[in-house]
Amino acid sequence: MGFSSELCSPQGHGAVQQMQEAELRLLEGMRKWMAQRVKSDREYAGLLHHMSLQDSGGQSWSSGPDSPVSQSWAEITSQTENLSRVLRQHAEDLNSGPLSKLSVLIRERQHLRKTYNEQWQQLQQELTKTHSQDIEKLKTQYRTLVRDSTQARRKYQEASKDKDRDKAKDKYVRSLWKLFAHHNRYVLGVRAAQLHHHHHHRFMLPGLLQSLQDLHEEMAGILKDILQEYLEISSLVQDDVASIHRELAAAAARIQPEFEYLGFLRQYGSTPDVPPCVTFDESLLEDGEQLEPGELQLNELTLESVQHTLTSVTDELAVATKEVLSRQEMVSQLQRELQSEEQNTHPRERVQLLSKRQMLQEAIQGLQIALCSQDKLQAQQELLQSKMEQLGTGEPPAVPLLQDDRHSTSSTEQEREGGRTPTLEILKSHFSGIFRPKFSIPPPLQLVPEVQKPLYEQLWYHGAIPRAEVAELLTHSGDFLVRESQGKQEYVLSVMWDGQPRHFIIQSSDNLYRLEGDGFPSIPLLITHLLSSQQPLTKKSGVVLFRAVPKDKWVLKHEDLVLGEQIGRGNFGEVFSGRLRADNTPVAVKSCRETLPPDLKAKFLQEARILKQYNHPNIVRLIGVCTQKQPIYIVMELVQGGDFLTFLRTEGARLRVKTLLQMVGDAAAGMEYLESKCCIHRDLAARNCLVTEKNVLKISDFGMSREEADGIYAASAGLRQVPVKWTAPEALNYGRYSSESDVWSFGILLWETFSLGASPYPNLTNQQTREFVEKGHRLPCPELCPDAVFRLMEQCWAYEPGQRPSFSIICQELHSIRKRHR
């Protein structure tokens, strides 16, 4: 019987929590009781000492000081003083010994309760996410894709004309590709969920409970030692008191840690209630495309997607394996240290080892989680690898429907097409091209001439802006804009003329727009005519249009964007690829979740407000913001190479040192520009830099950035969102951010670069990292790092901010190092 086999159910978890609360209350009662005993012994010793002082005047018997009575009394008073000293020493021994150790035990017990609850909640959340939420999401998407595929197939089969049939077939092939790819994701997700379920109920949860039982039993043994030490110190020599103490000692001796929780287990233990494991939902295949449950689809449509998935899973497996080895080494090291300390520690000092025992149990639990992740990735890799090995060097199987379509094409039709490449080959070429760039973006749109664009897309159309704001926008004679009249369904042409704004209502009748004279089918055509002909708007006013005043270039409408696939996820929401409808510019679109509170949405837009003012080749470029409706978007240039950290980890092995020097030089140039603008980034790291297809590095993610006139920003919030391992000591200790603190972060970025994406301060927690740095320690030199670059790193990590180099000096130094390096 044990926690791991009897308390795996939610009821068992509740019972454990109640037990921990009850035991903590008992320990607190013991501590108060012992403290009262110490206080009582001190007071009693003080009273005895006071009695001795009162008789120190040497009152003697009438027969003189040499009489037996006087000598006896003197001996009594002297021994009373000795007794007071003994009792006082006992009180101090109780305070520094059992009472102090009991306080440490209570503190460790509270920490154990907190750690256990956090780990149990984490395990349950991860199980729910992997086993339920992710699977349900995949199933919902699966059903949608099955419906889309079925509908596309029906339209394809019903199409009669060649043109319609080709178009329908193209849509059907696309739907098949999406369905097959998602089917593969669902198969991999189910396999991962099954393994996570297995690890959760076989290893991770039982391991957590076994660790808890081990620590509880160890603490029970320590409590036994504390009570025995207390009784030994407080024991007196009188027979009646000794008899009581023998009974108390016997009671303390009856404590047996290994049997301490048997009664608790008998009362609350139960058979583990393991819920059924997830399986492939075969109802999804009722209208499917001859798909097999639990089997990956490998054909001409999915070959490249399977290859890319295999590569990705293999890379993730390598990282997971490295993590497992690291955690195994940590567990072994802690076991060795604990064994050594146990040999050199008195049994009654075992309470001092509790924190290390808890560290060991936490490390073992972390190892179990890492092994679960490794097994999931291993299983997914084996599924993908076996499928690829079955294919061998041959061609992937054709999709049956498309294969039939090949045979149905008549020779006459082929001749009529003039030897054109078969449709399937064109489609295969199209699909293979999908995977060439880092991200896929929507296809180009057909561009529309400016004059043919609708009114709301015209740069000089400002919408329903207040009339008072018009006077601020129009500054020179002939400046104009078109706006919507407030409170009326009509459009107004506002023009600056003779030093004051003039407002002309655009007349509309018979679907024509005019001021005086000819009418035009649209307002853009009317404005284009007035601007090109330079004729007065009205004969009476003589006003002529010279220059259109554009609306804020950063303002975009949601309709201005064509969203593509999701390419990432940020702190505030998803990130998508996309295009601008106006000119087909590829963009990255950051979205803000609608459920976020207003203050977080304001922080989301903070990045856009910062970037509006900047224009530098090494700073990611802002294109616009969409704030007219939910969700809010920030639109930025699309940097195809992805983030710098992933780039280092995947491409670093083939990069030359000179290339790395060029890339960190780009980062330094961008930060020098920000420094000149009094901008403090506050979150400079490899993960927040982007890489173009030509290996140009750009600074990104300005969500934590601030602009301060004196170049210093004082943060008032806590450290919850602060990247501790990248942040300077003065920022962590006093909330003082400056360009000098960004220089410290740049030193960590240099270290990440030349360690090819390694994590700084591995195996250290955030608190341990702070203590490590405060003691004067710094990161070691990476293997590939030139000596001159490491010296620059050390300058960036000077403890005093004033001793760190500026970004201007860093740029010059990196440029010099790059010129010297061959």
Curated annotation (Swiss-Prot):
Keywords: ATP-binding, Cell junction, Cell membrane, Coiled coil, Cytoplasm, Cytoplasmic vesicle, Cytoskeleton, Golgi apparatus, Kinase, Lipid-binding, Membrane, Nucleotide-binding, Phosphoprotein, Proto-oncogene, Transferase, Tumor suppressor, Tyrosine-protein kinase. Residues 1-260 form the F-BAR domain. Residues 460-549 form the SH2 domain. The modification Phosphotyrosine is found at residues 261, 713. Autophosphorylated on Tyr-713 in response to FGF2. Phosphorylated by LYN in response to FCER1 activation. Phosphorylated by HCK. Its EC number is 2.7.10.2. InterPro entries: AH/BAR_dom_sf (IPR027267), F_BAR (IPR031160), FCH_dom (IPR001060), Fes/Fps/Fer_SH2 (IPR035849), Kinase-like_dom_sf (IPR011009), Non-receptor_tyrosine_kinases (IPR050198), Prot_kinase_dom (IPR000719), Protein_kinase_ATP_BS (IPR017441). Disruption phenotype: No visible phenotype. Mice are fertile and healthy, display slightly reduced numbers of myeloid cells and are more sensitive to lipopolysaccharide (LPS). Mice lacking both Fps/Fes and Fer activity are viable and fertile, but produce fewer offspring than normal. They display elevated levels of circulating neutrophils, erythrocytes and platelets, while other cell counts are normal. GO terms for biological process: cardiac muscle cell proliferation; cellular response to vitamin D; centrosome cycle; microtubule bundle formation; myoblast proliferation; peptidyl-tyrosine phosphorylation; positive regulation of microtubule polymerization; positive regulation of monocyte differentiation. Residues 392-420 are annotated as: Disordered. Signal peptide: none annotated. Residues 1-300 are annotated as: Important for interaction with membranes containing phosphoinositides. GO terms for molecular function: ATP binding; immunoglobulin receptor binding; microtubule binding; non-membrane spanning protein tyrosine kinase activity; phosphatidylinositol binding; protein kinase activity; protein tyrosine kinase activity. The modification Phosphoserine is found at residues 67, 408, 411, 716. PANTHER family: TYROSINE-PROTEIN KINASE (PTHR24418). Belongs to the protein kinase superfamily. Tyr protein kinase family. Fes/fps subfamily. This is Tyrosine-protein kinase Fes/Fps. The lineage of its organism: Eukaryota, Metazoa, Chordata, Craniata, Vertebrata. The gene is Fes.
